[in-house]
Amino acid sequence: MLRHSISALALVALAIVAAPMSAQQPRALKVFISVDMEGLAGVVSGVEVSANGPDYGHFRAIMAGETNAAVEGAFRAGATEVLVRDSHGDKRNLLPADVDPRARLLRGASSGPKNMMEGIDSTFGAVVFIGYHAKAGTPGAILEHTSTGNVVDFTINGVSLPEGGYNALTAGLYGVPVVFAAGDRALVEQLRGLLGPIGAVAVKEEIGDASLGMSPKRAQDEIRAGVERAIRSRAKARVYKLSPPYTMVLKVKQERALYAGALKVRDGEVTFASPDLLAVLAAFNAMK
């Protein structure tokens, strides 16, 4: 009888020890969402995304709507944490009270080279772009530019990059893939050309300098579903990288003061090289 009791106790003890080992804890999945404004549904004029514009409040609300749709899609896909980076202008467009309370919001201008990607690190599993736009000079694009209206072209190692391109490179430094982007059709085509077949929603397209697009509600519905799909299939996404050293060529309409280490190639064109991508981006931010 004693022997049977000891055996039973041993089995109970084994079960207690084994239970935590067999119970699978959910893996942490952090999602980084960078949100710009020019690529939001309905936006067609720079006045609409300027703080002193009469319709800014309206499009600020649309920005929050598309942001929250992406946040919801991320959590539906299993995200355990979401960081939203306000990435437009002075980075003070999203009002904290308007953002899904499950997400953390990073707002305000950054002095660091990551800029629109401030906060990204290797603990994240996926990056999402909302409200993004094509690079300067892109035909058939809406409000196309590269960071400022002064930039004509920006290349790294010979690759001409939109904001989404160099932001994807920044994420790539930490091994994090961009899995989804929303913006106009030209933006979607441009990023897929650089990053491969990422999830995307083209919320509008250019027709004779006008914008033909989805209603905000439909855009938000498609973003929510698209982000969820993209994050669920993130294992297929490609981390975007270029091989160091990094050589940038920046063409501008009006020259700024030369950054330390930069060289003037000709009027309106400068170059800078470094094995450190963040150093290159710092030079770009100083001279753009």
Walk through the language-model features, giving the residues of each.
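Active-site rim beta-loop-alpha module in soluble metabolic enzymes
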Residues: 170-178, 182-228
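Sec/Tat signal peptide C-region and signal peptidase I cleavage site
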Residues: 19-23
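Active-site glycine-rich loop that binds ribose-phosphate moieties when present
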Residues: 148-174, 183-186
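C-terminal accessory domains and tails appended to enzymatic cores
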Residues: 82, 219-288
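A glycine-rich helix N-cap at a beta->alpha junction
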Residues: 100-120
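Mature N-terminal segment immediately following signal peptide/propeptide cleavage
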Residues: 25-46
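Bacterial N-terminal signal peptides
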Residues: 7-18
